[in-house]
Amino acid sequence: MVPREAPESAQCLCPSLTIPNAKDVLRKRHKRRSRQHQRFMARKALLQEQGLLSMPPEPGSSPLPTPFGAVTATEDASSGKQCPRAGSGGAPCSRRPAPGKASGPLPSKCVAIDCEMVGTGPRGRVSELARCSIVSYHGDVLYDKYIRPEMPIVDYRTRWSGITRQHMCKAIPFQVAQKEILKLLKGKVVVGHALHNDFQALKYVHPRSQTRDTTYVPNFLSEPSLHIRARVSLKDLALQLLHKKIQVGQHGHSSVEDATTAMELYRLVEVQWEQQEARSLWTCPEDREPDSSTDMEQYMEDQYWPDDLAHGSRGGAREAQDRRN
C-alpha cells in the first residue's frame, strides 16, 4: 500500500511559522535599539543646547594644536631628516601623523565594565569579585556572570551588591571568570566608573591609554556648577546628565545597569575626551604601560591581616631595618 502524501498546506506549515517569528524577533530588537539610540541622542542635543556640553568640531575646522617643538610628518619629510627613536638619545617624535581630527575608538573596540563585590576575610572587610558585567558600545550585554570568590564570603553586602547566597549556587570560580573577562578586555578601550576598584577586584592592570573612567566626565563639561567635587557618584551623574534614575530600590545595584550608564556618559563627551587623548598621544607618543608597583603594593598591605600575622610582619620589618642600620 502506497502511503498518501501529506496535504500541501501541512507540508509548508512549519516554514511559514518559523520564518516570520525570526523576522519579528529581529524587527523588535532593531526597534528597541533604535528607540534607545533616539533617547540618547535627544539627551545629548539637550545638553548641547543648554551649553552643558560643547558642540563637536565641524568638518574642515582648524586642526588640533601641534605641541611646541614637535615635528610634523610634512616637516620631517621635507627636511629629509630621520626621526630618532625613543631612547636613542635624541628627542623622540610621534609615530603618528599630526592629528587633524580626533577619531575615537571603533565601537567594536570599546566596552564598559562594572563589578559587584562581596566581603571576605576578617570582618568581611576584604572586597572580592562576585559579579561582573560587560556591555558593548551600543549597550548590548557581552558578559554577565556570578563569580565565586577565592575566600569564604563573610558579608554579601546585598544592600549594595545585590548578591545573595542563592546567586553563589550558579557562580563560576574566580580563576575561570578572570580568564574569560580579561580575554574580552584585551585590546579594548574600557569604560567604567571608579575603574580602579573593578581592576583591583580582577587583580588586573589595564593600560592607562585605553582606560576611560567616567568619574572624570565633569572635566569635559563647560558648566562649572557641575564641578561640585572631584569624584561624583555614578548615580548623581546619571541623574544630572542623563535624566536617568539608577540604583534605586532595596535589591542593590545592577552591574549591567551601571555598566550601561557608564557607557552612555562616555558617549556624551566622547568627542572631547578623544580629542584630549589625541593631544596627549601627540605630546607623549609612546604608550607607556601603567606602573603596576603601586597596585601590587595594595595587595601587600597588612591592614586586614590577623593580628598575629600583622604583628609578626611588622616585627620582622623592624629587625631587617635594625640590621641595615
UniProtKB/Swiss-Prot annotation:
| Region: Disordered, residue numbers | 53-105, 281-325
Q: Where is the composition biased (Pro residues)?
A: 56-66
| Record key words, sorted | Apoptosis, DNA damage, Exonuclease, Hydrolase, Nuclease, Nucleus
Q: Which Pfam families match?
A: RNase_T (PF00929)
Q: What domain of life is recorded for the organism?
A: Eukaryota
Keyword GTP-binding assigned to the entry: answer is no
- InterPro entries hit by this protein: Exonuclease_RNaseT/DNA_pol3 (IPR013520), REXO1/3/4-like (IPR047021), RNaseH-like_sf (IPR012337), RNaseH_sf (IPR036397)
Domain Exonuclease, residue spans: 110-266
Cellular location of this protein?
Answer: Nucleus; Nucleus, Nucleolus
Instruction: Specify residue ranges for compositional bias: Basic and acidic residues.
Output: 308-325
Q: What is its main location?
A: nucleus
Q: Which GO terms describe its molecular function?
A: exonuclease activity; nucleic acid binding
Motif Nucleolar localization signal: residue span? 27-35
Location of motif Nuclear localization signal in this chain is 165-188
Record GO biological process? intrinsic apoptotic signaling pathway in response to DNA damage by p53 class mediator; response to ionizing radiation
Its Gene Ontology cellular component terms are: nucleolus; nucleoplasm
Q: What does this protein do?
A: Exonuclease with activity against single- and double-stranded DNA and RNA. Mediates p53-induced apoptosis. When induced by p53 following DNA damage, digests double-stranded DNA to form single-stranded DNA and amplifies DNA damage signals, leading to enhancement of apoptosis.
Q: What is this protein called?
A: Apoptosis-enhancing nuclease
Native organism: Pongo abelii (Sumatran orangutan)
